[in-house]
Swiss-Prot record:
Post-translational modification N-acetylalanine, affected residues: A2
Protein name: Ras-related protein Rab-9A
Primary role: The small GTPases Rab are key regulators of intracellular membrane trafficking, from the formation of transport vesicles to their fusion with membranes. Rabs cycle between an inactive GDP-bound form and an active GTP-bound form that is able to recruit to membranes different sets of downstream effectors directly responsible for vesicle formation, movement, tethering and fusion. RAB9A is involved in the transport of proteins between the endosomes and the trans-Golgi network (TGN).
Gene Ontology CC annotation, any one: Golgi membrane
Binding site for GTP: 17-22, 33-34, 38-39, 65, 124-125, 127, 155-156
Keywords of this entry: Acetylation, Cell membrane, Cytoplasmic vesicle, Endoplasmic reticulum, Endosome, Golgi apparatus, GTP-binding, Hydrolase, Lipoprotein, Magnesium, Membrane, Metal-binding, Nucleotide-binding, Phosphoprotein, Prenylation, Protein transport, Transport
Intervals of motif Switch 2: 64-78
Organism: Mus musculus
Annotated family: Belongs to the small GTPase superfamily. Rab family.
């Protein structure tokens, strides 16, 4: 795959105000704007990178977290290769809503095998001192819901932002490798010469 670029669609989901737009902008442009408005509908940015020898274009989709925008965002779930479920560590309700976001994504993205779909969990706004969700709580949720990787991030100071998105790519590549292996084990070699018949007439 080296030398050839793949396009991966990665979608950020979570309550409004948890910092999804800021995470996307920090990762793609390395900028932080505290005055960002809530996303209406969806928007996306592209980022080219190399992960473990694989050249990848990440198409990162940011979605509106408010309930009233559900009909605008859900049509864009289809075709996603990875979902970054995002909450804010200073907002316990956004953490409690992770399960609802996961269910919404699986339904509208029409995920055929939810158990193997690559989710990555982000606990954002770690720069805020007054936490409502502990690291241990978040790690326990990840373990109980699919053994998902968990990153505590800050779009403001860029903590773990690049690491989280790169892990998303690794998860996608691992999923693709598994499916390619399954396909290869079921194929028949049409170019293999038949063994000569050793029986005599």
């Amino acid at each position: 795959m080296a030398g050839k670029s793949s396009l991966f669609k990665i979608i950020l989901l979570g309550d409004g105000g948890v910092g999804k737009s800021s995470l996307m902008n920090r990762y793609v442009t390395n900028k932080f704007d505290s005055q960002l408005f809530h996303t209406i509908g969806v928007e996306f940015l592209n980022k080219d990178l190399e992960v473990d020898g694989h050249f990848v274009t990440m198409q990162i989709w940011d979605t509106a977290g408010q309930e009233r925008f559900r009909s605008l965002r859900t049509p864009f779930y289809r075709g996603s290769d990875c979902c970054l479920l995002t909450f804010s560590v200073d907002d316990s309700q956004s953490f409690q809503n992770l399960s609802n976001w996961k269910k919404e994504f699986i339904y509208y993205a029409d995920v055929k095998e939810p158990e193997s779909f690559p989710f990555v969990i982000l606990g954002n706004k770690t720069d805020i001192k007054e936490r409502q969700v502990s690291t241990e709580e978040a790690q326990a949720w990840c373990k109980d819901n699919g053994d998902y990787p968990y990153f505590e991030t800050s779009a403001k100071d860029s903590t773990n932002v690049a690491a989280a998105f790169e892990e998303a790519v690794r998860r996608i590549l691992a999923t693709e490798d598994r499916s390619e292996h399954l396909i290869q084990t079921d194929t028949v070699n049409l170019h293999r010469k038949p063994k000569p018949n050793s029986s005599c007439c």
